[in-house]
């Protein structure tokens, strides 16, 4: 394993913040009362809390100490842009009492950036999967929603849109350095084959495709569905993995997670593709790359999860 392979924001511990500290921080963004409730939420690299008062609910987000301000400004500006370009149900950035979206606070002895976004009603797809009756309609809805989100982000740019991100498809080849972290020999060989396929086939074809800022993380934890109709997507959260990348990779990420769940690349992709294409026409060259990119994302997930396990890091949201 290459000891030079490093992504500090994933390796540094999440901020040390308890419920009381979170409530103290939240009062700068919302009116609290004696009945206010703090609920810790799972997260990959930062610390998030659901803050509930009699008036509203909101999400307090405390960044990892190693997170760069410019990356968080990029995410905030993207949310503000989407407020103007789409009617989709998405988190909205909230200003604090001083009119700021992002502030620096000492949290657990470290300086961290703190912000707040609105809470979205809906049920995470991962929590309701067992009662899904019509996966076809679900996938059509997911594809359609993602396409609308892509259209909303089209034309948006930011100085930090190319920030280093381990989940960037463009970083695929860097994962050769940590293949040794996969203990199971068969899994390691399969992962290596996937990386070689990307290197020798997918990479060049992908370089010719359309690029724009994408969400890059349509996984079942981030997809919100209706309680009344769990096949209908009503919102999407977590814009922490956004970056400038090939547009088709946004759909490939969604297909990868659905493929894992249905154990079939075809059934995990076909209706997502149809739903997406019905709203935002894909080029033939993009559609042809979809299976390769979904396969690549599955391999990335395996390799990254094994790397994080080898460093005793949290595996949440892999």
Which residues does each predicted region cover?
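Juxta-kinase regulatory segment immediately upstream of eukaryotic protein kinase catalytic domains
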Residues: 1-32
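A glycine-centered beta->alpha junction motif in the catalytic cores
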Residues: 116-131, 177-181, 300-314
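Conserved small/polar residues in nucleotide/adenosyl-binding loops
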Residues: 316-318
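Active-site acidic catalytic loop and adjacent metal/ATP-binding pocket
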Residues: 42-55, 59-60, 93, 199-249
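An alpha-helical support segment within catalytic cores of ATP-dependent transferases
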Residues: 18-28, 154-158, 174-216, 226-228, ...
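Active-site activation/catalytic loop segments of kinase-like enzymes and analogous catalytic loops
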Residues: 247-281, 296-313
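A cross-family kinase active-site recognition segment
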Residues: 129-186, 211
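ATP-binding pocket architecture of kinase catalytic cores
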Residues: 54-157
């Amino acid at each position: 394993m290459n000891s030079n392979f490093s992504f500090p924001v994933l390796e540094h511990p999440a901020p040390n913040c308890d419920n009381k500290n979170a409530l103290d921080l939240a009062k700068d963004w919302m009116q609290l009362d004696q009945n206010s409730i703090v609920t810790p939420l799972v997260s990959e690299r930062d610390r998030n809390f659901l803050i509930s008062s009699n008036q509203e609910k909101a999400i307090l987000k405390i960044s990892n100490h190693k997170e760069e301000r410019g990356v968080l400004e990029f995410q905030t500006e993207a949310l503000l842009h989407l407020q103007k370009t789409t009617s989709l149900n998405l988190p909205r950035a909230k200003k604090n009492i001083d009119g700021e979206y992002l502030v620096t606070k000492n949290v657990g002895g470290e300086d961290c950036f703190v912000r707040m976004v609105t809470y979205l009603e809906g049920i995470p797809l991962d929590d309701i999967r067992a009662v899904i009756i019509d996966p076809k309609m679900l996938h059509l809805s997911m594809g359609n929603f993602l396409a609308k989100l892509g259209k909303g982000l089209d034309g948006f740019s930011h100085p930090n849109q190319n920030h280093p991100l381990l989940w960037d498809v463009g970083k695929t080849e860097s994962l050769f350095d940590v293949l040794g972290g996969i203990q199971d020999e068969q899994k390691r060989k399969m992962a290596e084959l996937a990386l070689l396929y990307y290197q020798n086939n997918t990479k060049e074809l992908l370089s010719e495709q359309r690029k724009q800022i994408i969400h890059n993380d349509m996984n079942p934890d981030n997809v919100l569905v209706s309680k009344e109709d769990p096949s209908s997507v009503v919102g999407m959260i977590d814009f922490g993995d956004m970056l400038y990348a090939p547009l088709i990779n946004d759909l490939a990420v969604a297909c990868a997670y659905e493929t894992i769940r249905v154990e079939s690349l075809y059934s995990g992709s076909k209706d997502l593709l149809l739903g997406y294409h019905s709203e935002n026409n894909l080029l033939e060259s993009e559609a042809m790359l979809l299976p390769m990119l979904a396969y690549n994302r599955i391999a990335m997930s395996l390799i990254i999860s094994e790397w994080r396990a080898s460093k005793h890091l949290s595996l949440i949201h892999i």
